[in-house]
């Protein structure tokens, strides 16, 4: 077999492949064995017609398409290896010759990975992130944890305040006419949650139980119900009940409830500070890495093939479908609710898809330029890490994946990202840890 590659404009080229006649004849033999089982010829049992009779009656041409189907996949794969090209989409194939006793010749128009022209990726200026945990951040985390233990208590006296949960009846109207979905009784609303039309919750502050009030608001211009968008509405509102969160005091007992390894408040704070500091350092490093990746990608010049963007869009739509499935929705239901279709969703995702493709190509090109590879030791460490994280044996992970190619590539790219950050110049007058 011989193959030649002729580069064309952009990211396309013409692959011309010639398969020797002897392979063609073998493929025709295989094709005959397949086809003869499916035909009936008077005077012969089904599947027993001799080859000469078959060709006399139907012509050898009746075997050509099956022979092509047999020859093409292997021939195309070998041609890719021989010419060392990297296709990014299915080729457009045109058969130029298929005939008994002659070579099989076909041409394939192939879209290949684009040329990546790297810009600066070392010495990038990135902002050094704060890693020191403040006392305020620690207290905020403590308050947040205590908030989960809070109990809702009825406010016997007093007025509605931000953070309270009020039980209300309301009836909304526009131009004196009630509208669908604008009425409810016994509705619980947390003041400050932002779950109602802007301005509604704030107007309830200061009200007392059994008090009634006309709450006047204006629907946002981008409101999902077009007939209400931008219009002023009046909600006749009555407060039935007011509840507030009663947050427990941090005691040794509560500290142990929040952290089984802490027996005192001080131990709880110490453990929490350590965890938060570690997380803040990790988050800071990730932000710095993301900035380095973005700048390295921005400095790279690539003519991205549309086929690669479409492949990434397919992946993103699939990921989106999985996410909404966890919320009990399928794509078609989502489209009905949102008023979108798949083409509109893909259009919304297109910029992100292009950026993903460009980033992946950039990081891969840097790995090649720097001769970065994942060693067996690197892969073993990553497998051990995954084993601990998901509580699965290394062998089970290997069996699930089939091979370690995905892990190998992930580790390789992570090494590139580390290189970008390690070689960056940190600004804002701070220094790297």
Curated annotation (Swiss-Prot):
Entry-linked SUPFAM superfamilies: FKBP-like, Triger factor/SurA peptide-binding domain-like, Trigger factor ribosome-binding domain
Domain of life from the UniProt record: Bacteria
GO-annotated molecular function: peptidyl-prolyl cis-trans isomerase activity; protein folding chaperone; ribosome binding
GO BP term (any one): protein transport
Pfam family for this entry, one: Trigger_C
Record GO cellular component, one term: cytoplasm
Disulfide bond entries: none
Keywords: Cell cycle, Cell division, Chaperone, Cytoplasm, Isomerase, Rotamase
InterPro entries listed in its UniProt record: PPIase_dom_sf, PPIase_FKBP_dom, Trig_fac, Trigger_fac_C, Trigger_fac_C_sf, Trigger_fac_ribosome-bd_bac, Trigger_fac_ribosome-bd_sf, Trigger_fact/SurA_dom_sf
Residues in PPIase FKBP-type domain copies: 163-248
Reaction(s) catalysed by this chain's protein: [protein]-peptidylproline (omega=180) = [protein]-peptidylproline (omega=0)
Xref: PROSITE patterns: FKBP_PPIASE
Entry domain remark: Consists of 3 domains; the N-terminus binds the ribosome, the middle domain has PPIase activity, while the C-terminus has intrinsic chaperone activity on its own.
Family: Belongs to the FKBP-type PPIase family. Tig subfamily.
Role, per record: Involved in protein export. Acts as a chaperone by maintaining the newly synthesized protein in an open conformation. Functions as a peptidyl-prolyl cis-trans isomerase.
Name this protein carries in UniProt: Trigger factor
Organism of this sequence: Staphylococcus aureus (strain bovine RF122 / ET3-1)
